[in-house]
UniProtKB/Swiss-Prot annotation:
It catalyses: L-homoserine + ATP = O-phospho-L-homoserine + ADP + H(+). Keywords: Amino-acid biosynthesis, ATP-binding, Kinase, Nucleotide-binding, Threonine biosynthesis, Transferase. GO terms for biological process: threonine biosynthetic process. GO terms for molecular function: ATP binding; homoserine kinase activity. Belongs to the pseudomonas-type ThrB family. Its EC number is 2.7.1.39. It comes from Cupriavidus pinatubonensis (strain JMP 134 / LMG 1197). It comes from the Bacteria. Pathway: Amino-acid biosynthesis; L-threonine biosynthesis; L-threonine from L-aspartate: step 4/5. Pfam families: APH. It is an enzyme of class 2 (transferase). This is Homoserine kinase. The keyword Ion transport does not apply.
Length: 330
């Protein structure tokens, strides 16, 4: 989250007249992330203060956004702890602010666990599987907009910034994934609405009696219909690694995948293509971070991520042995 579009106290106070949320007490920009303008919003009504998150969307359109917002509402009504969009007085959950789409959602309690252990990873795996099952009957359809077609489209824009070894790696991996995505095995993989960006900083934990309890997932604005195995691979590639090397931490990876498998059993075909999906997850974020790093947009508090992190992860996944990639331990 970042701030590309600034909003004054008077502007948000006027905008909130269309909501039944009381008076603005504080609006504070959120520095993390790089896609949208995000703010913590505090209001007061009848002597009680409440916390929300205001998001102004910088790339997504009014036509695209209902998929994400209604997915969050759908999951919230099915017991998955996610931010719930707040409707305005007219019932709409998406409105224009400073000429751009904007929404208000509930603020989840807790803090991100940036140094997760196996127990944290197991909780995330369990909720991710429950989220996938809860989304099965979500009626809206939208593909993951940062999948293979986007990687192929973006390749030409980022190749000039790469050295020869990086260009070869990028081109070969996109070709591998294109072949995989076109296979009968890929077509047979189960899927549905996916988060597609479930990193450590997109989940919150509450401390309860000395135990960190998962409080929920947020930032669904990269969500889309995709293969569930891809969503799990993206999550493992962030939560279950040594950050310095990109190497998988087996204890955390096993905990997350086994907890997921206990709720939604993985098929033999999914197990056979685990490494392909770990590679796909690494490629997706290597491409997007190269794009954000070398072709940045101006923003207050913008903090682009280092693209070499996911290059290392991709190289590590390519070097996995067949035994390590087979999920034989689930």
């Amino acid at each position: 989250m970042a701030v590309f579009t600034t909003v004054s106290h008077d502007e948000i106070a006027s905008w909130l007249l269309d909501y039944d949320l009381g008076e603005v007490r504080e609006l504070r920009g959120i520095a993390s992330g790089i896609e949208n303008s995000n703010f913590f919003l505090t209001t007061e009504q009848d002597g009680r203060t409440r916390e929300y998150v205001l998001t102004i969307f910088e790339r997504l359109t009014f036509d695209q956004l209902p998929y994400y917002l209604h997915l969050m509402a759908h999951l919230a009504t099915r017991g998955i702890t996610v931010p719930a969009p707040i409707p305005a007085r007219d019932g709409e959950i998406l409105r224009a602010l400073k000429g751009k789409p904007a929404t208000i959602v509930t603020r989840l309690p807790g803090a991100s666990q940036l140094a997760p252990d196996a127990e944290h990873c197991a909780e995330v795996g369990d909720m991710l599987a429950r989220m996938h099952l809860a989304g099965q009957d979500y009626p809206r359809q939208q593909p993951n907009l940062r999948s293979l077609p986007w990687w192929q489209q973006t390749e030409a824009e980022i190749v000039p910034f790469l050295d020869a070894q990086q260009r070869t790696l990028l081109q070969q991996e996109i070709a591998h994934q294109a072949a995989f995505f076109g296979s009968a095995d890929y077509a047979a993989l189960p899927g549905g609405p996916c988060h597609c960006d479930l990193f450590r900083d997109n989940a919150l934990f509450e401390e309860v009696g000395g135990h960190h309890r998962l409080g929920g997932f947020f930032d669904f604005y990269f969500a889309g219909n995709d293969k569930w195995l891809f969503d799990l691979a993206v999550t493992v590639n962030d939560w279950c690694i040594d950050l310095a090397s990109g190497e998988l931490d087996n204890a955390r990876a096993h905990a997350m995948v086994q907890a997921y498998h206990a709720v939604r059993p993985l098929s033999a075909t999914e197990a056979a293509h685990w490494r392909d999906m770990l590679r796909a997850g690494a490629l997706r974020f290597w491409v997007s971070r190269l794009w954000d790093f070398y072709l940045p947009r101006e923003a207050d508090m913008l903090q682009p991520h280092d693209p070499t992190h996911f290059e290392r992860i991709l190289r590590r996944r390519l070097a996995m042995t067949a035994d390590a990639a087979a999920l034989a331990w689930i």
